[in-house]
A protein has these predicted regions:
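Amphipathic alpha-helical coiled-coil segments
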Residues: 40-52, 114, 118-141, 148, ...
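Bacterial Sec-pathway N-terminal export signals of envelope proteins
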Residues: 20-62, 67, 87, 95, ...
């Protein structure tokens, strides 16, 4: 038993100094493939892209036909035919096409941000499951020990070898371990149900019970440069700045005169009149304040992007410091448990009658509380690391 504990602690220590295989990847890959949420977001993205490519062409041509009865009838009837096509100023089509491409980029970044949030949620569920899976192993072992003690105490109680107090303590300890295992199983089932929901309703299991943490570089600013470049939410805000700047150029082009070109014909008995028509609009008030609005939106986009960057920097800087402190705590707990693995010694001392049942249960409780704290600290470390490295999902 002691060797098993030491090997587990050794794995935790190695995980702090080296990055192992990604234990979450298989589950995350399944969720990315089966998630109904992601499928809906993909369809929404395609709809947005199609919408952004709509309205890039000139307006529909207009055709008119007129038939006028003459009076008196001897004058005959008149027929009018006209065909007209209206055009925006040519540069407007150039800017609309480029704006469409930029809007599609923004839509892709928005999808990537929502995808990252979903994958991060799934990873956090897995991290919680690792904790409860490990805790389940600990308390299953405790339950086994409690069952053996309760059975032995019951036999001794029947023969009068022990007092009622020790017997009651053994029974209560056994019931307590049963309830604790049941509580842990309920939490594991809840988390497994969350994973199944994220996986589009398809059953998925995650039985890993050991963490394999990554190692962060010492310098936060160097690391943040990578995180900032890869964070979809910030990429989206930066792309929105480009969109707003392109809208300024488009609003200027829309403020220029519109052109129209067409054909017109008038036909009366004995006389036909036909030819081309050309028109130009006078841009007086239709697009008034559009350029001002576009500039204001551009300034707002830049302010939002800068604000988001500052918040993101401070949030990650806090997480970065938290991770460093948690790593120290994990090493402290792991070293203490490695040097003071008392479970085997306590079992031996109790079986030889060197310590009472009360002392044995008290010492075991103290020992497993420390073990649980190690697991909790390891879980908190992994959750913080998950947020720090979410842009890599």
């Amino acid at each position: 038993m002691r060797k098993k504990l030491l090997s587990i602690v050794a794995v935790w220590l190695v995980a702090l100094s080296a990055s192992g295989q990604d234990i979450y990847l298989p589950v995350l890959q399944q969720i990315e493939q089966n998630s109904t949420t992601l499928n809906a977001l993909k369809e929404q993205l395609e709809a947005q892209k199609i919408g952004n490519k709509t309205g890039l062409t000139p307006a529909n041509p207009e055709v008119e036909f007129g038939y006028l009865w003459g009076s008196p009838a001897v004058n005959g009837n008149r027929k009018d035919v006209s065909l007209q096509q209206t055009f925006d100023f040519p540069t407007a089509y150039v800017h609309r096409g480029k704006l469409s491409d930029l809007q599609n980029n923004s839509a892709a970044f928005q999808y990537a941000s929502e995808r990252m949030d979903l994958m991060l949620s799934a990873k956090k569920v897995c991290i919680e499951l690792v904790y409860y899976n490990a805790l389940r192993q600990i308390y299953a072992r405790q339950l086994g020990n409690a069952a053996k003690i309760a059975s032995a105490q019951e036999k001794m109680n029947k023969t009068g070898e022990i007092n009622r107090l020790e017997y009651n303590k053994a029974m209560i300890n056994y019931a307590d371990m049963e309830n604790e295992v049941r509580r842990i199983d309920i939490e594991r089932q809840r988390l497994q149900a969350e994973l199944t929901a994220l996986n589009g309703g398809q059953q998925i299991t995650f039985d890993v019970s050991e963490y394999q943490s990554s190692v962060l570089p010492e310098n936060f600013d160097t690391w943040f440069a990578e995180a900032e470049a890869g964070m979809p939410a910030l990429q989206y805000l930066r792309s929105e700045i480009e969109v707003s700047k392109r809208k300024i150029q488009l609003s200027r082009a829309d403020a220029l005169p519109k052109l129209s070109l067409g054909y017109m014909g008038e036909f009366v008995p004995g006389q036909d009149f036909q030819g081309v028509t050309f028109g130009i609009s006078i841009p007086l008030w239709e697009n008034k304040n559009r350029i001002k609005q576009a500039k204001a939106e551009a300034r707002a986009s830049e302010s939002m992007a800068e604000d988001a960057k500052v918040k993101y920097y401070n949030h990650l800087n806090n997480l970065f410091s938290q991770v460093k402190q948690l790593q120290v705590s994990v090493r402290g707990y792991a070293d203490a448990l490695k040097k003071n693995a008392n479970e085997e010694l306590l079992n031996k001392a109790y079986s030889l009658g060197e310590i009472s049942l009360m002392d044995y249960l008290h010492e075991m409780e103290y020992y497993y509380i420390a073990y649980d704290k190690l697991l909790q600290t390891e879980r908190d470390l992994e959750l913080a690391l998950a947020e720090l490295t979410a842009f890599r999902l």
